[in-house]
Amino acid sequence: MNTLIFTGQVAIVTGAGQGIGFEIAKQLANQGAGIILNDIDQSLARQAAEVIRENGGECIAFAGDSSDPEVINGMVDEAVKCFGKLTMAVANAGITLFGDFFEYPVENLRKVLEVNLAGSFLLTQAAAKQMRQQKSGGRILLMSSVVGHQAHQFLGAYAMTKAGLEMLAKNLVLELSPYGITINSVAPGATLTERTLTEDPAYPKTWSAITPMGRPAICEDIANAALFLLSPFSGHITGQSLVVDGGWTSVSPLPDLSNMEVK
């Protein structure tokens, strides 16, 4: 890709204080986009935005809960105030919350639904309204997961939200396409992030053994797919989910979680 392919574009990226979200925000900024970088952790948001600015990118930190309508509307307003428009939105923020189905706490269920589904829906709605008003199209990207396609132990609530996001994208094709707005999702497989490595030090070994490509993804792998779907090269692609899993869903072996402690 041309290193300045996103010049003149403006993106909101949620859950971007670290991991996949940060990598997407960083790559967009490196290629010319202005960024509103969101994270619920104010310190992470500020640090991530500073790293991007130190590398020559335009980036504004916007801390807050990305499932809160006031925060979402504030991010859209900030994009318009600081950059004059909003052309891309990446609903990356999400939580996992493993748990035994029979004992899964209702408060965990509500939180997963609120952050993963409601937050993504509300960001999509607010961003699309702004894009419709601008009359110049736009790109919306949802962060799904391979567990929205394939069963996995202890992830019933999480998997439900990810499958729901993909169906949201398909349905919104009918309402967004007349305005030149595309909406797609990326479905990462096992990915090395600060969170996955902290939760399970054996994560790289476990997933390398059962991934056909011989390794889990790194954040750059997911960001590269995201940038394609946000770029001009994907202008006739909408309502689709791009799986980035090193071939895992082709064979779908499950990791051994027999020793995993779940609540």
Task: Describe each model-derived feature in a short phrase.
Residues 83, 121, 215-244, 249:
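C-terminal substrate-recognition "lid" of short-chain dehydrogenase/reductases
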Residues 129, 174-178, 235:
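Alpha-helical segment proximal to the catalytic Tyr-Lys
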Residues 100-101, 105-113, 196, 207:
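Substrate-binding pocket helix/loop in short-chain dehydrogenase/reductase
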Residues 4-35:
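Canonical Rossmann dinucleotide-binding motif of NAD(H)/NADP(H)-dependent dehydrogenases/reductases
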Residues 90, 177, 182, 237-239:
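Short, small/polar-rich loop/turn modules that mediate ligand/substrate recognition or access, typified
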Residues 124, 161, 169:
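Active-site helix of classical SDR
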Residues 145:
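Residue(s) in the substrate-gating loop at a strand-loop-helix junction
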